């Protein structure tokens, strides 16, 4: 059990309090759902969900953690690749 406690403490230091992160992420997703006018493919929706998750971590935690920004670019790239004919 100490391992999960350590992991949660490390994540908390990097990303902030989880309940606040959850509120931020869910509010971002609500905005997308409220204004979405077209049905998205599953990968597009999932990428947006994950991007909201990563933005929540950036806003709530360490905005200088490059990996969060890298992940956002990666999710967007996966969709762009599929749209351009390369399914990963």
Regions found by a protein language model. Give the residues of each.
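Intrinsically disordered, low-complexity regulatory regions
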Residues: 1-88
